[in-house]
Amino acid sequence: MRKKKDGQNLPDFRKNPPKLDKKAYEKELKRLQAELVDLQQWVVETGARVVIVMEGRDAAGKGSAIKRITQYLNPRSARIEALPTPNSREKGQWYFQRYIEKLPTAGEIVIFDRSWYNRAGVERVMGFCTSQEYRRFLHQAPIFERLLVEDGIHLRKYWFSVSDEEQIERFEDRLSDPLRRWKLSPMDLQSITRWEDYSRAKDEMFIHTDIPSAPWYTVESEDKKRSRINVISHLLSTIPYEKIDRPLPEIPHRPDSESDYVRPPRDEFRYVPDVAAHLEEERIKKEEKAKKAKKPAKAAGKNSDKQKSSGGKGKKKSKK
């Protein structure tokens, strides 16, 4: 328990935080997303470069956090990179080469949904790289990142942490949801039986790559809503951006046409079918059906009232 200045005990939410209230979450998320728009405007105007690395356990909430970060950003200057398995040509290159090609130019934000740290995680655990390649990566990654930072890139690295119990629950949710089942890969399922191997790989990765110029920040992600608020808030607090006030553009008045242009007849165009009209038709039918169902109920209620009143009058007469 924590204490207020007046000595009153308060629950300590840092160890076992409760689920975030939905309304409070949505309100704060909108505020932070508005700030992200300001951040992007500053990046574009100043020519800054931002790289955000999102790593963590499978189903830890990286993807949903990225979705909220980019929801209102201009995709022309903010993009997500989720590189597939390297092809034969990429396997013959320097390991970092294919990631260098995806780095931002001036005025861009790039979010890596998994990154060069695949080598320290899945490749290490599943045996997709040799021990020599793995050790070389741990040596070169800090050097590579120092070069990025020295060149002026704002580099942020986040590790989304989730418990094994919560991960299983999320896997089960994905399995039961046809719309999200594609997110459950064979590699995800194998990670269940290799939990401790991944834990050791993560610990080793932190030891070698958590450097002052590019530190790791852990995001507690048992509650996805809480993790989204926390990671966005941290990102905004660590980049020294300023809100750039730009004059609002004026929407011009469309002048009256002075030409003899006449739009071609509607039937000359090919339109997609208006299947949405069926939704409105169904709504109207349901409303009419509900009205018809109410009428007999009202009639039955009136008859019942009449019977009660007539029964009451009869009783009074018998008393006389």
Swiss-Prot record:
EC number assigned by the record: 2.7.4.-
Q: Which InterPro entries match?
A: P-loop_NTPase, Polyphosphate_phosphotransfera, PPK2-related, PPK2_PA0141
Q: Which residues form a coiled coil?
A: none
Keyword set, alphabetical order: Kinase, Transferase
| Pfam families in the record | PPK2 (PF03976)
Name the gene for this chain: pkk2A
* Molecular-function GO terms, alphabetical: polyphosphate kinase activity
Renumbered to this chain, region (Disordered) spans 1-21, 246-267, 281-320
Its recorded name reads Putative GDP-polyphosphate phosphotransferase PKK2A
